[in-house]
Amino acid sequence: IDLLIQTMKRQSAVSMNTIAGRDFYEGNLNGTPVVVVQCGVGMVNAALCAQVLITSFSADVVINTGIAGSLDPNINIGDVVLSTDSVNHIMDVQNLGYEPGQTPGIEVAAYPASETLRNTAKSAALKLDLTAHEGRVASGDRFVREEKEKERIKTVFGASCCEMEGAAIAQTCYLSAVPYLI
């Protein structure tokens, strides 16, 4: 995040607004207006920042970067995973007739990511000689370290990786009809 902010400052004037305890930096990257924020750890922080970006800054897309744990033996440390969709691996109300990961009142369990954003990110990764994978991102407010839990997330959700914010951003963007990419 600091590198993005430094790059913005070299290219344009940057203003900073603090909302809900988070610093939102407005500026330009390569001529494109952007807002950069570090949401912090967890689903609530992520959803909060996504909603502020959408309502206070009129974001027309939301892109999240961060660290995830691989659930696929073909994804290595340093590789990039571009979301095809995102799912909350903690949400479980199957006893009420919902799919694993599905939030009551929402018709889908997995929130589709923007194919346009994914293709743009894939092209950028290739130019930077990064190994990029496409797959489902599973999120939950828990650090997943036990092999049994990793296998459950991979088997039940078909996830490529897991982390702690993406599905909250995805759900917020889905409900607000804003394209996103994790």
What does each of the following model-derived ranges do?
Residues 1-51:
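N-terminal short beta-loop-beta anion/metal-coordinating cradle
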Residues 3-5, 47, 72-74, 91-92, ...:
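Short glycine-/acidic-enriched loop or helix-start segments at secondary-structure transitions
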Residues 7-14, 55, 76-87:
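A glycine- and small-aliphatic-rich helix-loop capping segment at beta-alpha/alpha-beta transitions
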Residues 52-57, 74-75, 171-179:
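Alpha-helix C-terminal capping segments
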Residues 58-63:
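Proline-aspartate-enriched helix->loop->beta-strand connector
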Residues 71-157:
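Mid-sequence, gly/pro-rich, charge-dense loop/helix-turn segments that line enzyme active sites
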Residues 143-182:
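A C-terminal functional module that forms or caps the active site or interfaces directly
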